[in-house]
Amino acid sequence: MARTKSTVIARKVTGGKAPRKQIGSKAARKSAAPSNTSGGVKKPHRYKPGTVALREIRRYQKSTELLIRKLPFQRLVREIAQDFKTDLRFQSSAIGALQESVEAYLVSLFEDTNLCAIHAKRVTIQKKDIHLARRLRGE
């Protein structure tokens, strides 16, 4: 038995307007297509909102490298240390250990912040979620 192309497409129901039916025939669409390619400029490809974000989440969850650049972090540490004592020197391993612990703290804070946003039935984290997460931690 030969396979035929099914015209029924499963769609996720998100509310809003119902999809419109295609009225034009194949011949009408073929005649309209060449005018678009010859005169118009092709739009650059864009992913749906959220697709790139999900891809980045998967990418960074797989990786183990440091996400904050080393030199800007080192300058920040030296600037903060300058307030306590002048002419302090740091071993490179000390800066690396500080950076590891800072990134671990931030990742853990954002995980708790995300849980606070989900608890409020949202997917976007807000400033108040960070405040709540820190308060629950006792910070």
From Swiss-Prot:
Positions of post-translational N6,N6,N6-trimethyllysine modification: K5, K30, K42, K85
Residue numbers bearing the N6-acetyllysine modification: K12, K17, K21, K26, K30, K42, K62, K70
GO terms classed as biological process: rRNA transcription
Gene3D superfamilies linked: Histone, subunit A
GO molecular function: DNA binding; protein heterodimerization activity; structural constituent of chromatin
InterPro entries linked: Histone-fold, Histone_H2A/H2B/H3, Histone_H3/CENP-A
Mod. after translation: Mono-, di- and trimethylated by the COMPASS complex to form H3K4me1/2/3. H3K4me activates gene expression by regulating transcription elongation and plays a role in telomere length maintenance. H3K4me enrichment correlates with transcription levels, and occurs in a 5' to 3' gradient with H3K4me3 enrichment at the 5'-end of genes, shifting to H3K4me2 and then H3K4me1. Methylated by SET2 to form H3K36me. H3K36me represses gene expression. Methylated by DOT1 to form H3K79me. H3K79me is required for association of SIR proteins with telomeric regions and for telomeric silencing.
Residues the record lists as N6-methyllysine modifications: K5, K12, K21, K26, K30, K42, K85
Main location: nucleus
Keywords from the UniProt entry: Acetylation, Chromosome, DNA-binding, Methylation, Nucleosome core, Nucleus
Region (Disordered), start-end ranges: 1-48
GO CC terms in record: nucleosome; nucleus
UniProt similarity note: Belongs to the histone H3 family.
Chain's role: Core component of nucleosome. Nucleosomes wrap and compact DNA into chromatin, limiting DNA accessibility to the cellular machineries which require DNA as a template. Histones thereby play a central role in transcription regulation, DNA repair, DNA replication and chromosomal stability. DNA accessibility is regulated via a complex set of post-translational modifications of histones, also called histone code, and nucleosome remodeling.
Quaternary structure, from the entry: The nucleosome is a histone octamer containing two molecules each of H2A, H2B, H3 and H4 assembled in one H3-H4 heterotetramer and two H2A-H2B heterodimers. The octamer wraps approximately 147 bp of DNA.
Identification of the protein by name: Histone H3
Taxonomic classification: Eukaryota, Fungi, Dikarya, Ascomycota, Saccharomycotina
